[in-house]
Amino acid sequence: MAEANPRRGKMRFRRNAASFPGNLHLVLVLRPTSFLQRTFTDIGFWFSQEDFMLKLPVVMLSSVSDLLTYIDDKQLTPELGGTLQYCHSEWIIFRNAIENFALTVKEMAQMLQSFGTELAETELPDDIPSIEEILAIRAERYHLLKNDITAVTKEGKILLTNLEVPDTEGAVSSRLECHRQISGDWQTINKLLTQVHDMETAFDGFWEKHQLKMEQYLQLWKFEQDFQQLVTEVEFLLNQQAELADVTGTIAQVKQKIKKLENLDENSQELLSKAQFVILHGHKLAANHHYALDLICQRCNELRYLSDILVNEIKAKRIQLSRTFKMHKLLQQARQCCDEGECLLANQEIDKFQSKEDAQKALQDIENFLEMALPFINYEPETLQYEFDVILSPELKVQMKTIQLKLENIRSIFENQQAGFRNLADKHVRPIQFVVPTPENLVTSGTPFFSSKQGKKTWRQNQSNLKIEVVPDCQEKRSSGPSSSLDNGNSLDVLKNHVLNELIQTERVYVRELYTVLLGYRAEMDNPEMFDLMPPLLRNKKDILFGNMAEIYEFHNDIFLSSLENCAHAPERVGPCFLERKDDFQMYAKYCQNKPRSETIWRKYSECAFFQECQRKLKHRLRLDSYLLKPVQRITKYQLLLKELLKYSKDCEGSALLKKALDAMLDLLKSVNDSMHQIAINGYIGNLNELGKMIMQGGFSVWIGHKKGATKMKDLARFKPMQRHLFLYEKAIVFCKRRVESGEGSDRYPSYSFKHCWKMDEVGITEYVKGDNRKFEIWYGEKEEVYIVQASNVDVKMTWLKEIRNILLKQQELLTVKKRKQQDQLTERDKFQISLQQNDEKQQGAFISTEETELEHTSTVVEVCEAIASVQAEANTVWTEASQSAEISEEPAEWSSNYFYPTYDENEEENRPLMRPVSEMALLY
């Protein structure tokens, strides 16, 4: 190392020591050749010797030749006295080329990685032209990248070639010397070329797989497009076929439908050929190991299934129309047969039957007619019913019965004539007389053969002459009385069957609508593909939005619908069908109770894209909220249909059970309605279910009446009635205030703020209040609290009073039974002592009552005491008679479970005597 300036040499030395990869063992210092520089170097090195004093020796060399003592000349360049051929500028050029090539390889790797990521993560479009365009663009980019890889490979090979030393005779020794220098660079370039080759191989493999997948994706979309088009066309033909479902009508209309069906069959053949081609194409894709193998097989099966349905439906429709045409043809031929028979009867004149030859000719004509009409006459109605039951409409059945009766009557007439003509041919004594059936036979015939604008003709035999008598229309009407009643009965059966059919058909539609809602909306809320269209807060609201609709669907689809279908030909089974499953209908109460919460969710999220997309897929004209209302509408529809069915089933088999079913459904509706009101009660501390069954509920106008004890000034100043909603339970009566929010988006269901609750064992009533016959009193305890209640009408008032009386009666009966058990446990002595004590109390109570009340109330008190004494025998009778006497006298009547008061006037309320509790008075009897 040569350096004129020692300090700079020292700095360079330190840098080399820090960056040298190995350990330093010896430092050689070459001094400058000029005198001054050598002198300065020696002085500077002397003063800075301590800086160079390291843990290794430092040798100061005087000349270049001294280097050969320490270093081989093959390791030194010519300027240092060595033989090593080295060009620093050439080394810099090669070094820059190597570094640039390495950077190019790195950038190429990044480009390939970026392109692969783009191919893997880019979402493909949903239309075929866009897919083809993307496939072309990616193929072009692939070829550009391939060209870049080829250019980089070529550059690396050129650089690798330049690093190799030419193999000449004069340069053999120098090549060996340079081999060690260029071997490291050559290995670097070779390693980079290997890396480029591996990247190219991996990229080609990736592109081959991606191109195959893209081609298969394009094939799948073309297959799916053909599939959807065929499905649409098949469904269109199925809809056209369904329009031919009504096989009734005239024979001309049936012919027209058969012609339309033939045209439809021709169109279907071409469509089925296309479907077969698409199915074969799908099988070919599956055989080529398509990545969507399961989907393609599923589509092929669906297309094959739809094709089979189309073929079977057309085949079944052809058979049905052919049978209908055959039926119409039979009816037409039977009518012609009847017409020919009528003409034959009408053309047989009396004077032609006076000889044997004429009689034989007439007999032959009759035999020919009967032989021709024999197939129609011998056609049994049961056979017709069995053969054409599916296509027989009520009109066709009526026509068939009419023609059948005509044929039977014609046969009867001709058989009688045959017998007469045969007798005439055997006897040659007296002239032939025309033989006709007796009037009794004509009366029993169901349908007359000859009709006239003025009346109908019947045949009679008067002595030896034959006459035609025209029966007036009035006589015909009188004679048709029994048949009209029969027609009335038949019409009731038709109406009953119509209602039953409506019940079954609407049940099928209802089940199908529930299925579409559960599948098209509820199930889609769990579909990850729809999460982007759904607000995050809506995803966990499925059970609130749909309630227990799935439970309702399973009940109707698995159980109730099949039970109703079994009643299609047996209307008497409808009642038991509802009664056996009335407990299952309680699930509707749960659904209705959840309905307010469901509507709140719907109002909040009704405009989100999820519901709109589901509605679009289902092709529903109505939004989801209309279908969420279907269970509520259905449970109210049952009682209407049962009413109609009961209306047409009077005095029929199963009408009693049908009435019970109707009552059960009405009770269910009332229970559901009551439960809806109960869940709207706010502020009640406790469990409302502990109050027993809700009997009634309704709104009333309420005034605070006079109370015993202190009265607040605000109660005295209240003239305007309070609006209260009363809930009557088995064990209590609850007072609430009805609240209805107003404004857009508010809940349309009312809520009830709890005010107070009275236990029924402390409640009493006064049935009549002067001033308005709609008012009555409800009071608590010893009239500590009194409310005057006004109903909307008298009927509502009487209904409430009746239910309250029933509750009080039941409590009185329970109390009586309890007292009786206690009395049975007492001894005779105890009974005697209690009896004496109670008699004393009774006399004392009567004395006090006499002093505090007027004489006009005494009789009422005695009647009440007597009623209490006999309550164990006939409790209901006592209460009923007391109620009736109160209604007749139009005086206030009071009822309580613990205390009884005599009749009173409003001005004498404070002076009313207080009677003993029932628990004490019941022991007097």
From Swiss-Prot:
The segment(s) forming the CRAL-TRIO domain are: 1-88
- CDD domains documented for this protein: RhoGEF (cd00160), SPEC (cd00176)
| Provenance organism | Homo sapiens
Quote the disease note of the record.
Answer: MCF2 and DBL represent two activated versions of the same proto-oncogene.
Where, per UniProt, does this protein localize? Cytoplasm
Q: How does it assemble?
A: Interacts with an array of inositol phospholipids such as phosphatidylinositol 3-phosphate (PI3P), phosphatidylinositol 4-phosphate (PI4P) and phosphatidylinositol 5-phosphate (PI5P). May interact with CCPG1.
- Residue ranges of the Spectrin repeats are 221-322
Q: What is this protein called?
A: Proto-oncogene DBL
Q: How is it modified after translation?
A: Phosphorylation by TNK2 enhances guanine nucleotide exchange factor (GEF) activity toward Rho family proteins.
Q: Using the record's annotation, list all stretches that form the PH domain.
A: 687-809
What disulfide bonds does the UniProt entry report for this chain?
A: none
